Amino acid sequence: MKFGKTFANHRIPEWSSQYVGYKSLKKMIKEITRLQEDIYRAHNKNSYDEGRPPTKMRDSSNSAQNYLDSPKIQKLLASFFFAVDRDIEKVDTFYNSQYAEYKKRFERLLSSNQFNEIKSTLVVDANKEDAVAQTLLTKDTREMNMLLKGTSQASRLSYHKDDLIEIQSILAELRKQFRNLKWYAELNKRAFGKILKKLDKKVGTNQQMSTMKTRILPLQFANDSLITKDLSLLKTIWEQVTFRINSYERVMRSTSPNANANDNTEFFKIICVFIEEDDSKGLIRELTNLYSELSLIPTRIMISVLNKAALSKSLACIDAILKVIPSLNDSEDINRRNFFHHHIIAIGKLIRKQEILSRKKKSQPSKYTNSEGEIVTDLRTLHTTLSAPAESDSITEEEKSSACTLSYILEELPIHLRPCLFQHDNYKRTPLHYSCQYGLSEVTKLIIKLMKEWNIWNEIPIDDVSAFGDAESLTPLHLCVLGAHPKTTEVLLQSLDPNVKLKSSSLLHLATEWNNYPLLHVLLSSKRFDINYQDNELHETPLYLACRLNFFEAAVCLLYNGADLEIREKLFGWTAIFVAAAEGFTDIVKLLIANNANFDIEDEGGWTPMEHAVLRGHLHIADMVQIRDELVTHPHSQLNSGSEEKEPLNEISAGELNERNENGNGGNKGSLGKLAGPIKSYGHRFLDNNESLILITLGSNDTRNKSPSISLSSEALAKVIGLETDCALSLVISCNDSIDKSSVILDLPLDDNVDAVDFKVPFKVDYSHTLYFDIVPTYGTRSLETHNRIDCQKNNNNYVMARGVSMLNKSYSSVGVNRSILNGSVTVPIIANHTLEILGTLKFEYIIITPFEHPQLPLERTETYWKSLVSTRVIGHRGLGKNNPNKSLQIGENTVESFIMAASLGASYVEFDVQLTKDNVPVVYHDFLVAETGVDIPMHELTLEQFLDLNNADKEHIQRGAGHSPHHVNGADTALQKYRGRSVDDSDVSTLRRAWDLHDNDPNGKSNNAHWSDNRMRLTKTFKKNNFKGNARGHSIASSFVTLKELFKKIPANVGFNIECKFPMLDEAEEEELGQIMMEMNHWVDTVLKVVFDNANGRDIIFSSFHPDICIMLSLKQPVIPILFLTEGGSEQMADLRASSLQNGIRFAKKWNLLGIVSAAAPILKAPRLVQVVKSNGLVCVTYGVDNNDPENASIQIEAGVDAVIVDSVLAIRRGLTKKNEK
């Protein structure tokens, strides 16, 4: 997940309209870069026919290629900065307004009489808690004894604890508000830094530093010093108040052993007893005794006693208090709240506490699936299931009885006290606001009923901010929706006149984000909202939002109430089916299709939902939204045609592939235009002989591992770091050996799928490098370039709050010379700087790429070689093709004979798999397990001698076998020897078949030799899975295993090699049960490279591998031989994120300067137009798989612009393509 998604998901819902328009600004940058690319292409056209290397992609670091003096680009830049200025103004205005409001509330608290009365009793130094505790306990005991004796000082103590509890509640709310505002400011500051950095990187400007310095950093929201200071003071007071409350409770328990230790509602037992027994006379008598006269009792005490009596449903006590209480308002109340405010808040907290205590975690069956586990898509069935209110919103007996008691109070209330029910507190909230906030539907119903009876209720929209808005512009209806209270929401809506129209259609978006069916259904059933309302920023409807967030319940409710499925959002012209298909939300896609969503449509870039799903690896979803339009499924490339060039449908920057395929100028459906050819350049920067590269991945590339990369305990942070817990934190990664003495800064919390961090270091044989992971305050210790490197000398102990350290040469246990473990995950503790307590953990993976030396390394390719790389060609898979269990003549896969025949039949390259034996010799073999041994043994556990001798075992058996005369065997061997000595054509097939027929067969047509071979392998994992083994005698024309060096000598020099480096990924090793110990990767790659460079002699060579780290090493160790990244493209489930989809494969290949990708044919066949996505990113596109054995499939791909197809049936595909070209 990149910052764009993190930004959207981390916003505070009620403030969603007040954030930076990040996506809109991002789209504007894409428009600028698209125009730059158009100008660049017009000046630099590729000339493939002349055999010259293709033109490089536009380099934004080259000012001459940015065309910033172009009037069109200057106009777009002016529009961009105008939009940035408007966003800066919006964010700054909102932040200042909210901060002023929260600051005013805090200052009001600190200046209140209640706070001043208890301030002198607070702990001065919270760090001396143990020393002060005894003093306070003694003082509390003395005060409590004075209370019990009826002394005059007891009157103050009687309400101290209530004041403390209220102050604690206010502090908690203020802390939440300040923290939300702080996060709001931090998120927007990051967004500005990110978008300006993206502008500089993509467009080639140099605006981030200057704009941040002059326009953003001087503003208050970009500097958190004031709010951090407020939070620090607030935290100090919070700790002292909490300590004081706990002290009172200890005194109560020590002074009155029979008192209820859990009673937090009264200080003195006797008053509580009178209220609980509803003894009004005793209550009045005790109060009179305490204060001499009723008129001397503070209003605050009277309100507190009335509140307790109401909570206890003590009607007699209520009557007695109402007769003597002078007012329901306490002029000295901190928040200017009256009895009704306090009482409704107390009811809400009491019911919420009961719900928490009674809530039990139960695993309930899914409401969305039937008995077979299939998703239900019928709206009526789903509506019946989902429309029942949640248990948390049901009306409890406590609420009913509380509402009855409140009703009784209101009936007995003198007329002159009625306005108290509608009085505003300091937050501009009435009791109705609080009843809605806590979801008290019965109380809300009662208040509205009385307002109507007393002619106070005005028939105006309940969501009208001017009439009902509080200090934060939240109305009672807003509070109901934000609290997800459907019952209370229904009460509010039913109280309105049918003709009254509501003003806040955006409430549907807020309700959608709760994914609460009953809440949404109540809103929509009222018919007062526009169900298709589009927000102002992105024009997203509630249905689109539900589908983007994968909120099934919300989507069902919206569809049931008639939401339009075909409304498009603003940025890319996507409907709901687009975002659901692109994100891979299977259930949502099924639901939309069942409700007739149109998926045979294109977005603004000309792409269909099917193509978006394929690109992101969701092939099962692509099947659901598959379209049959031949203009999409059989596009025609104009790559080498002489027709007029057309704009491509879409060009995607590799850096943006984690988002959407946003760019796009439209274009005609089915016409790919003149595809941008692969424009990769070689001779790229690689490691010098004295350099290594450390590549660090925070977390894991394994998508099965869901644990966070960094886990910090909030409790430990609060305890150890103290006042700084409310400051923004960053992670600084540094290496002691970094050549440029730099560090990398990442703001916390980390975005998902953070790009790998790298350090170039001096080469050390023992890998003795040390990594530091420091937790530091975000502000005051960094340069203006967010997420860029800073001088590691600044990262000193004055700023480091906590640190984790990893010594890389000690991070794993040694498993042998040139051996390593596959699961390279390291977890280090994060230790506090001063206390040395563990604050959390950090998990990462790393690889160290060491340099490779060879005399032939500076070798350069000719222009003819470039031409061969960009011309469509056929590559023989494992030579002539991989073997299959069909009863037909087959030459053994990965054999010399197979490679020679493939070349003679028209293959430009032959593809084969290379692995290393135990004694470090590269051999040609496909499977990780060598089944020919009769046991499941991996290749790296066999020596070369043992591996090659496996063929001799077969020959010896044949020579000893009964029924096989010497002339039979010798005849076959003679024919095979004749075949091996030269290239072959189709006429050799009959000779080979006759030689094969010399072997005796059993009645079933299977040779005795095959029985012997099968019997030996019958217990191996490979044979059990396939009941077959390639290049096995009896199944194919088997030949001897061969080393990589032998291939260079035996295969004609004009035949190119596509060398697949076969190194297992973690999930592959687990599936094949290979164990965790493998060849050390640098040693593996260096060994293969040495053989290749020793024997290349001008041969065309391409490396390829499914393992991303192997590709990285091959790219960084040498600049000569191009590398292709093999990917399933989503056709198979892969654990490594980089191999999980075509999109991630493109990003990976682009980042590490690879020649291109080799994708499984399935995704390309489903969406052939995606070939241009690959090629517009400067990459070669090659495909493989059994689908390529169909000439029609190969033809479709080649017409779409695929550079090469790897096939098993070389002759058939070549003939098919020839016939196609002739037509």
From Swiss-Prot:
UniProt-recorded Gene Ontology molecular function terms: glycerophosphocholine phosphodiesterase activity; glycerophosphoinositol glycerophosphodiesterase activity
EC number(s) recorded for this UniProt protein: 3.1.4.2
Keyword flag Magnesium: no
Each ANK repeat, start to end: 427-456, 472-502, 504-533, 538-567, 572-601, 605-634
Family stated for the protein in its record: Belongs to the GDE1 family.
PANTHER family xrefs: GLYCEROPHOSPHOCHOLINE PHOSPHODIESTERASE GPCPD1 (PTHR22958:SF1), GLYCEROPHOSPHORYL DIESTER PHOSPHODIESTERASE (PTHR22958)
Protein name from the UniProt record: Glycerophosphocholine phosphodiesterase GDE1
Organism annotation: Saccharomyces cerevisiae (strain ATCC 204508 / S288c)
The gene coding this protein: GDE1
